């Protein structure tokens, strides 16, 4: 089996290489692609040197079984036909195709079977905040239909990329040395010692694109009429996103029921003993595969409400790991010929 990573030099591309090696993903050859800036770079994968090729409109994907694409929406749209024309399965981390009717939007713990229906040869990876939330919501949905969700997200600097993370570190340095953050480029305001209640551009309804992704993607993934209202906030941590989630169900459910289903849910680690200061924090979820969940409690404002807190590594489960799990599911179902 032959796999490719498009955008190999980026944060998600690098994480993909680590995860493919960690999980002993069954490939004979890994091919790396990138822009003119990264072409020629060399990375090691399972003891072998892999040189990044320039991504071009040619036949380079002819013998590739699966391509993990993490190079931005523009590149995904531009190269989708080139990547898929010979039957390569394209697992795309951008937002380019997520809401297309003929492209499945997949979180394996929730709707893995959707990946088998892909008329264009493309499977979309959801937004990182959506992925982490629906992994936790799906077991609760089995207890009672979820009608409404309110979310406040606390999203780390690395969610905006490696350059954004470096900018945050530079701001802290400047503040310590001069008392003023002079480097403000990736964010609309100083992020160091601050929070910014805007991620992505504003839409006509005064929600951001990030917030609308959570509304639309959750419904598509869960095949549900659930209504989601989000406020997405950039915080000055480096890695892992967190979410405060309020859930209203059709029928009453208890905190004990929720804890029980989440304790055994795939992809979830339950950390919920706040009297002993045990609850999820982004610092400990960084570099981990699971979504951590805790602070589960009965909502005081509605009879059928549950409130909880979750955190997870947005580069791993929020992007790279989810993509690899999709490919693993296709292998399990016999979609690839393993040599």
What are these regions (language model features)?
Residues 1-191, 227, 260, 291-292, ...:
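N-terminal Rossmann-like NAD(P) cofactor-binding subdomain of oxidoreductases
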């Amino acid at each position: 089996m032959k796999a490719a990573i498009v955008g190999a030099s980026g944060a998600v591309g690098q994480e993909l290489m680590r995860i493919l090696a960690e999980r002993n993903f069954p490939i004979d050859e890994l091919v790396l692609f990138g822009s003119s800036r990264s072409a020629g770079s060399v990375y090691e994968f399972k003891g072998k040197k892999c040189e990044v090729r320039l991504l071009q409109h040619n036949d380079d994907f002819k013998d590739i079984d699966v391509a993990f694409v993490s190079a931005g929406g523009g590149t995904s749209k531009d190269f989708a036909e080139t990547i898929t024309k010979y039957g390569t399965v394209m697992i795309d981390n951008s937002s380019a195709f997520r809401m297309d009717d003929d492209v499945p939007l997949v979180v394996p713990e929730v709707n893995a079977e959707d990946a088998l229906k892909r008329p264009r040869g493309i499977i979309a990876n959801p937004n990182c905040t959506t992925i982490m939330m629906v992994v936790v919501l799906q077991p609760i949905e089995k207890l009672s239909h979820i009608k409404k969700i309110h979310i406040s997200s606390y999203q780390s600097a690395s969610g905006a990329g490696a350059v954004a993370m470096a900018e945050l570190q530079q701001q802290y340095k400047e503040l310590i040395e001069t008392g003023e953050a002079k480097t403000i480029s990736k964010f609309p305001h100083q992020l160091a010692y601050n929070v910014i209640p805007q991620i992505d551009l504003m839409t006509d309804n005064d929600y951001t694109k990030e917030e609308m992704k959570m509304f639309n993607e959750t419904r598509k993934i869960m095949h549900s009429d659930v209504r989601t209202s989000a406020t997405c906030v950039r915080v000055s941590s480096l890695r892992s996103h967190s979410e405060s989630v309020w859930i209203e169900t059709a029928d009453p459910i208890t905190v004990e029921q929720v804890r029980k289903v989440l304790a055994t849910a795939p992809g979830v680690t339950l950390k919920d003993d706040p009297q002993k200061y045990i609850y999820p924090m982004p610092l400990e979820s960084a570099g981990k595969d699971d979504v951590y969940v805790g602070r589960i409690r009965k909502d005081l404002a509605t009879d059928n409400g549950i409130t909880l807190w979750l955190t997870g590594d947005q580069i791993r489960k929020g992007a790279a790991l989810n993509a690899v799990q999709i490919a693993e599911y296709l292998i399990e179902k016999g979609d690839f010929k393993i040599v």
